[in-house]
A protein has these predicted regions:
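Catalytic strand-loop segment that frames the active site of acyl-thioester-processing enzymes
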Residues: 41-84
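Hydrophobic residues positioned within well-ordered beta-strands of beta-sheet architectures
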Residues: 67-69, 113, 129, 143, ...
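Short Pro/Gly-enriched beta-strand edge/turn motifs at strand-loop
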Residues: 35-41
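Hydrophobic beta-strand-centered segment that forms part of the acyl-chain substrate-binding groove
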Residues: 2-9, 96-128
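HotDog/MaoC-like acyl-thioester-processing domains
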Residues: 1-34, 121-123, 134-186
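Short, low-complexity Ser/Thr-rich regulatory SLiMs
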Residues: 58-60, 119, 133-135
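Hydrophobic residues in beta-strands and at strand termini
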Residues: 71-73, 117, 163
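Active-site helix/loop of acyl-thioester processing domains in fatty-acid/polyketide metabolism
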Residues: 59-66, 84-107
Length: 186
């Protein structure tokens, strides 16, 4: 088993840096870490083999600033006949809503995501997802989004994001993997 583990290290190659290692300063993400996050995104990342080619833009208009994304999903994403799997629809919403709240100063992590499915979201048709921030108070950011196939509203979502210190989150999660005893007893 040890030999297999050693061989595995050669197959895996050097460890890729994680997106948050790219440039969080004082717990706030910078442009470099944001760009790294996009490359590693499960739903649109160039470094993620299963991610569909989702185009995402920031749009400024009379109603304010929002994110608009377009994507066409093929058979690999099918759930119901001719429709996108609902879990994937929810995941796309989380990704698009997350991008929206990252336009704010000090973004956060998803605290709640509510999805309302209005119609089966079709595969092999261009989908448009639009997301915007509706509330920003203290540590809480609220954002909403819609998914359309042409003029057809297929789903809508609302998310609550909680602002966190990403440096602190990284430290706490890394400590969970550290087998050394905690000297503070906490």
């Amino acid at each position: 088993i040890e030999m297999a583990a050693e061989l595995r290290t050669f197959l895996d190659g050097p460890r890729a840096p994680r997106w948050y290692e790219a440039g969080a300063v004082a717990g706030v993400l910078d442009a470099q870490s944001g760009a790294a996050f996009q490359k590693q995104s499960l739903f649109r990342g160039a470094h993620t083999p299963l991610a569909p080619p989702m185009a995402m833009d920031v749009v400024d208009d009379m109603d304010g600033r929002r994110i608009e994304a377009t994507v066409t999903l093929g058979l690999a994403y099918e759930g119901p006949p001719h429709g996108v799997h609902g879990g994937y629809v929810a995941g796309m919403f989380d990704d698009v809503l997350g991008a929206t709240q990252r336009m704010m100063e000090k973004p956060g992590v998803t605290g709640r995501l509510t999805v309302h499915y209005r119609h089966i979201t079709p595969i092999e048709e261009e989908l448009t997802l639009r997301a915007w921030v509706t509330g920003d108070e203290g540590r809480r950011i609220v954002a909403k989004a819609t998914c359309h196939a042409g003029d057809l509203l297929t789903a809508e979502a609302e998310a609550l994001f909680i602002r966190v210190d990403f440096t602190e989150v990284q430290s706490r999660m890394a400590a969970r993997r550290d087998p050394s005893p905690n000297p503070s007893g906490a």
